[in-house]
Amino acid sequence: MKYVYTSILFLLVANFCSAQDILSIFATKGPNAQQSSLELFKRYTNPLAESYSWAISMGWNHTARPHRPIGFDISIGTAAVLIPDNKLTYSVDGIDGVRIISGNPQVPTFFGSNTASSVIGVKNDDGTESIIPATRGVNLSAAPLPFFKFGLGVFKNTELMGRIFPKLEYNGMEIKMWGVGIKHNIIQWFYREKSPFDLSVFAGYTQADGLYPLEQSMVAPVTNPGNMLFTTRGGDFEAILSKTFPLVTFYISSGFAYSKNNLQLVGDYTLLYNKEESLNIPPNGVTEEYELKAWKFGGGIMLKFGLVFINGDYSYSEYHLISTGLGLTLK
């Protein structure tokens, strides 16, 4: 099982550590140039923050029907946020003192091309210009978040739920995730007899954390490149309607996602060959925050063969969202 976990982790982040020279963005001089560097960092990482802010809100439900008391299910699943083309690149337009010296004017974001070779110029406060190679992407079109999920029926058509991706380490990289939720069938308050369908409300909380080693700066090598820390936490609130047949369940949902994402660079950014200087990073470090507040709408299908079920669903909002699962259930 640990081998499976490690393989998933490798697929998720292996490209990251082989392609990104993020620190060179801050090889500039002066407070005005620092703001330009911070804006470049924001435009590069914003799709990463956005996608995982969405990913943690997905994959909770495959039916509106809660388990009976002591009924349960356990499954493995993956939530994936599809990255649109307009999130694979960004433009430096509107950033004070920044220009494209050579190469494509559309620069890769985190998920963009890993072969692009644009060169960016950033005007320093002393009138000089820093020449910086554009940070390459990881060449991925989706942001996946795998997990183990379980649910337990308690009382009055209520189900307690949880999910986890245990902490794993691979070549200095770390990733972990956990979440808790509760689902309650409200249709019982409207139908005295058995309802032809199920209607439930759900609330859940999820937190995902990652740590990625940073590449040494090619422009201005530093004492310790350190890591990029990644934390996403937030809630998911949904109404789910489903219709169950002997072998298949159809479900639709509407909900509100709220989450916060924090990206932080942590290292010793004193220049390796000049201990009197450091990268142009704010005294309190580089911290990029992103907040998501948005509605989402979706639907899916669950196929059940004895105790085994398979489900898949699609949700639409600012991104296209897909989740799948495979598990065992006992009502």
Residue ranges and their predicted role:
Residues 1-23:
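Bacterial Sec-dependent N-terminal signal peptides
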Residues 19-97:
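N-terminal, post-signal peptide beta-strand-biased segments of exported outer-membrane/organellar beta-barrel
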Residues 60-65, 74-76, 148-154, 180-184, ...:
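Residues on the lipid-exposed face of transmembrane beta-strands in outer-membrane beta-barrel proteins
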Residues 62-70, 85, 187-199, 246-248:
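Short loop/turn motifs that connect adjacent beta-strands in outer-membrane beta-barrel proteins
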Residues 68-70, 141-146, 174-180, 231-235, ...:
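Residues that define the transmembrane beta-barrel architecture of outer-membrane proteins
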Residues 78-82, 164-168, 186, 203-209, ...:
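Transmembrane beta-strands of outer-membrane beta-barrel pores
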Residues 87-89, 110, 121-140, 169-175, ...:
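Extracellular/periplasm-exposed beta-strand and loop segments of Gram-negative cell-envelope proteins
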Residues 157-160, 189-192, 247-250, 307-312, ...:
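Repeated loop/turn-to-beta-strand initiation elements of outer-membrane beta-barrel proteins
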